[in-house]
Amino acid sequence: MEVRHNWTHAEVRDLMEKPFMDLLFEAQLVHRQYQQTNHVQVSTLLSIKTGACPEDCKYCPQSARYTTDIEKERLMEVERVLDAAQKAKNAGSTRFCMGAAWKNPKERDMPHLTDMIKGVKDMGLETCMTLGMLTPEQAKQLANAGLDYYNHNLDTSPEFYGNIITTRTYQDRLDTLSHVRDAGMKICSGGIIGMGESANDRAGLLVELANLPTHPESVPINMLVKVKGTPLETVDDVDPFDFIRLIAIARIMMPQSAVRLSAGRENMNEQMQALCFMAGANSVFYGCKLLTTPNPSEDKDMMLFKKLGINSQEVSQKPDEIEENELLDRVVERVAARPTKDDLFYDASV
């Protein structure tokens, strides 16, 4: 099967209508043609700045517009981020993702963010950040610091998007993806299933992703985690078979991409997760929490991988024998060398 960038809604709907087993069989054939079988890439996601986000994403408990149990937190100090990254590496993660609840980062944030990137890279981990919208210059700064991936989800179809978010446009998201690509970074972009969207909207999301000039290197498919206090807390649950179908179709449409089984895994039993891996998912987030939502523990994941004969992929960055204390010393030196009086503990929530 060739890699394409001209998918139509009709083609995706045809895939949706295929018998379930036939669809999974096709997806598995594509997966075996383009991907390493029985291997899953493992990432860890850390919230480096939580809550008080000015945006109105109806699914998100970090929005300042909704009353949830999430308390706002300042930008995490670099040393704490590196400590979490070291623990993630020790637990088997190969990529460390850092997320901040912002509409976009401010210039005062950039030195701290670049120090985080450099410190995590020194550990031999791949790096990823999700910080909201970026300007071209901010994208270049992150790339120059060594950031490997930037996550910026499209969330849903262009047609349904306005029902979920009004504080930034769909084009804003596409523009940020262009800035990231132009800066030389890899793209992580996907969406959320279960927000009340139609089958046509799910098809539209995949068409938008698959028809980008270059497919995202990572495509996270999230199942909505309903949080009390958000406008979507009472939306209907996603049918598991519909979700698995979306994984399979994403694999068929974007055969070279990593398809990540992302948020919502805590609500999936082992059988559903196994079918997602059969359908072509080959990446997961690892650890007990994804930003602010629950995630299966490392032990549960390792037990499932063992049952399925799945081995997590090895670290793809250069091996690094630097001790944790030396890494922290490097960060302290970088901070001390900055021509600024800004404190690492400034309140980034305002």
From Swiss-Prot:
Pathway entry: Cofactor biosynthesis; biotin biosynthesis; biotin from 7,8-diaminononanoate: step 2/2
Annotated positions binding [4Fe-4S] cluster: 53, 57, 60
Q: Write out the similarity annotation.
A: Belongs to the radical SAM superfamily. Biotin synthase family.
Q: What is its EC number?
A: 2.8.1.6
Top-rank lineage group of the source organism:
Bacteria
Which ranges carry the Radical SAM core domain? 38-256
Give the gene name. Answer: bioB
Q: Which reaction does it catalyse?
A: (4R,5S)-dethiobiotin + (sulfur carrier)-SH + 2 reduced [2Fe-2S]-[ferredoxin] + 2 S-adenosyl-L-methionine = (sulfur carrier)-H + biotin + 2 5'-deoxyadenosine + 2 L-methionine + 2 oxidized [2Fe-2S]-[ferredoxin]
Q: Would the keyword S-adenosyl-L-methionine turn up in this protein's UniProt record?
A: yes
Which UniProt keywords are listed? 2Fe-2S, 4Fe-4S, Biotin biosynthesis, Iron, Iron-sulfur, Metal-binding, S-adenosyl-L-methionine, Transferase
Q: Which PANTHER family match?
A: BIOTIN SYNTHASE, BIOTIN SYNTHASE, MITOCHONDRIAL
Q: How is the cofactor bound?
A: Binds 1 [4Fe-4S] cluster. The cluster is coordinated with 3 cysteines and an exchangeable S-adenosyl-L-methionine.
- Pfam families annotated for this entry? BATS (PF06968), Radical_SAM (PF04055)
Q: What does this protein do?
A: Catalyzes the conversion of dethiobiotin (DTB) to biotin by the insertion of a sulfur atom into dethiobiotin via a radical-based mechanism.
Q: Does the keyword Kinase apply?
A: no
Q: Where does [2Fe-2S] cluster bind?
A: 97, 128, 188, 260
Protein known as = Biotin synthase
NCBIfam families the record matches: bioB
InterPro entries in the cross-refs: Aldolase_TIM, BATS_dom, Biotin_synth/BioAB, Biotin_synthase, Elp3/MiaA/NifB-like_rSAM, rSAM
The annotated subunit structure for this chain is:
Homodimer.
A Gene Ontology biological process term: biotin biosynthetic process
User: Which SUPFAM superfamilies would you find in this protein's record?
Assistant: Radical SAM enzymes
GO molecular function terms noted in the UniProt entry:
2 iron, 2 sulfur cluster binding; 4 iron, 4 sulfur cluster binding; biotin synthase activity; iron ion binding
